[in-house]
Amino acid sequence: KVELSTNLMLKVFNGGMDVAEEVLVELMDKMNIHGMTIYKAPSMECWKTLGHYEKEPGTQLCLSEEKYLARFDEHHIHVINNTASIAVEYPQVYEHFKQNNIGSALQFSCLLNGQLWAVFEFDIFGANRRKWCQDDISAIYSVVKAIADVYKKFYEQK
């Protein structure tokens, strides 16, 4: 997984935003991830999806709320091994999980100039939940961070 994430990071750093989608598809394929959504701040509209969602993820405004962001750790990672665990507190997010048969998810909040600009979500479909191991989390985090860094450079040039 270290070799995979390193190769994908190099691909992003060398190819820029033009290869970001290709890199995400390869990451998903090699790590058996079924779906990926990017929510763009501040509206948290679905900006990009990869995978086969039964229902378009739509807007998840609560993802930008301080209360929800407090669920993320110091590295801006939110591990959801069982999506039912957030049903009571965040029914809108849980409804998205339920409609798309998502059992487990991994979310990364990305900052640009200290402000939230996107949340990347990686999903596992089906009843078999995935307990995310640290190696998986680290590999995915590295690739997301590389894409965010390249996006920041791209954004600053405009």
Each predicted region: which residue ranges?
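Signal-transmission linkers at sensory-effector interfaces
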Residues: 1-18, 153-158
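A short, aliphatic-rich beta-strand micro-motif
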Residues: 103-111
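Short coil/loop residues immediately preceding or within conserved phosphate-binding loops
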Residues: 33, 92, 105, 117
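Regulatory loop-to-helix N-cap segments in sensory/regulatory domains
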Residues: 124-143, 150-157
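GAF sensory/regulatory domain recognition
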Residues: 25-31, 35-72
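Sensory-domain boundary capping and coupling elements
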Residues: 110-126
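Regulatory sensory and allosteric helical modules in signal-transduction proteins
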Residues: 56-98, 106
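Amphipathic alpha-helical regulatory segments at dimerization interfaces
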Residues: 8-12, 21-30, 71, 96, ...
